[in-house]
Amino acid sequence: MSAALKISTPVFPMSVRWKSEVLGSSDIFPTMNDAAEPSMVGGRFFDSLWSKALHPTLRTIVRLFRRITHCLSTMGAAEIPVLNEWLAYAIHQLLSIAHDCMASDLHECLRLSVLVYSMVEIKTFGGLPYMSSVVTALRSRLRTGLPQIQRIAPDLSFWMLFVGGMASKGRASRAWFVAHLAEVAEQLSLKEWDTALALLEGFLFIYQPACPQPEALWNEVKRQQALELDA
């Protein structure tokens, strides 16, 4: 996990035995087709025009995170005894393809966004000091890649920015994510939280009514839009 917090490739290769044990427990996950039903989490990664351009290995890893997210949304962590093993495997895979994604803004922004999502939404490492470097890396790559991604996949850019906004809570970078979320929300005509939530769930997102942070971020976005209208 230290490699994830430092955004570096894994120091040690994955044990063949451990990998076999993890993959052998895959029956806990439901079979999910790429052409998902609208109610299925993560469907936008596979049924959008821009998704055809994704690196095959990155698509496979996103598919794995999609299955993990679906299980967490429907069963909860307590009912998935091998969750930590599967998450460690998925993050190891995500870190291992850094070289393949680096040349493409779309691929690298997506890779970093999924990494941040796994650390904040699933494992709740958001308060750790090393998270600042992860959030900084995502924002730095979005600074160059966001214009293109926003043009070809505004829905994806909204999800990436929202993930970054969640991870940047209490950090100076929060304002940057909020400002760009306000812009993309306007582009997508997102007016209400329920509509924004439906879009987020089309990617990777676990909504917990008892957790106020996502809606609090959305309220910041709405206040930012109001400020821009008054300016």
Residue ranges and their predicted role:
Residues 1-231:
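Intrinsically disordered, low-complexity activation-like regions
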